[in-house]
């Protein structure tokens, strides 16, 4: 269960904390094959929402599988309108990868560089 302000996952490599305003997750550390299952599990807990906010300011590394999991949440499982996934404070290297693979233009995905107010 996701509770705002409470660290929902921390294995020493990656930490995910639920945020209240905007509602979603603040993610820090490394997203790789060892932390990917935990990321997907937390994203699935948010799947019922129309808008999901992910603050990536603390992400030091993210592999393609991790990025793809976040991008696929935009509209995943929806038969009509896509949900919005808002990525806040995306590190420059992740912005570059999103652009190279073309995921930055995914319908329903918003890349917002303004501070999200992680609380």
Regions found by a protein language model. Give the residues of each.
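STAS-like cytosolic regulatory interaction modules
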Residues: 1-65, 71-119
């Amino acid at each position: 269960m996701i509770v705002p302000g409470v660290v929902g996952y921390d294995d020493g490599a990656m930490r995910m904390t639920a945020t209240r305003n905007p509602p979603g997750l603040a993610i820090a550390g490394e997203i790789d094959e060892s932390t990917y299952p935990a990321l997907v599990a937390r994203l699935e807990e948010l799947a019922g929402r129309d808008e999901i906010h992910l603050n990536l300011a603390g992400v030091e590394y993210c592999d393609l599988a991790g990025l793809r999991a976040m991008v696929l949440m935009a509209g995943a499982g929806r038969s009509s309108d896509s949900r919005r996934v808002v990525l806040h404070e995306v590190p420059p290297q992740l912005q570059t990868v999103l652009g190279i693979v073309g995921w930055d233009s995914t319908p329903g995905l918003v890349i917002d560089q303004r501070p999200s107010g992680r609380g």
